[in-house]
Structure formats: C-alpha cells, structure tokens
Amino acid sequence: MKRTFQPSVLKRKRAHGFRARMATVNGRKVLARRRAKGRKVLSA
C-alpha cells in the first residue's frame, strides 16, 4: 500500500493557508479560536 501523504505546498496553502481561512466565515472562526488559544502559528 502506498503512503497516502503526498505533500504539495500549493495544495496545502490553498486548503489550509491564511487567505483560505480568511475567505470564509467559518475559516475566520478557526483563526479566532487559534488566536484565543494563543497559537504561535495561526495557519499554514
């Protein structure tokens, strides 16, 4: 069986990047939660 994680920076940024998070209301909620928790890194 092949390894299922085949990294791609482009796909990672498009799916989980800061701009992707900011694009939707729920994404903004994700960022707000991570800020509230005190995460050093908010998004990919």
Swiss-Prot record:
Keyword Lipid metabolism applies: no
Domain of life: Bacteria
Keyword Transmembrane helix appears in the UniProt entry: no
InterPro entries: Ribosomal_bL34, Ribosomal_bL34_CS
Gene Ontology cellular-component terms listed: ribonucleoprotein complex; ribosome
PROSITE patterns: RIBOSOMAL_L34
Biological process according to GO: translation
Gene3D superfamilies, A to Z: 1.10.287.3980
GO terms assigned for molecular function: structural constituent of ribosome
Keywords: Ribonucleoprotein, Ribosomal protein
Family according to the record: Belongs to the bacterial ribosomal protein bL34 family.
PANTHER family: LARGE RIBOSOMAL SUBUNIT PROTEIN BL34M (PTHR14503:SF4), MITOCHONDRIAL RIBOSOMAL PROTEIN 34 FAMILY MEMBER (PTHR14503)
NCBIfam families associated with the record: rpmH_bact
Name of this protein: Large ribosomal subunit protein bL34
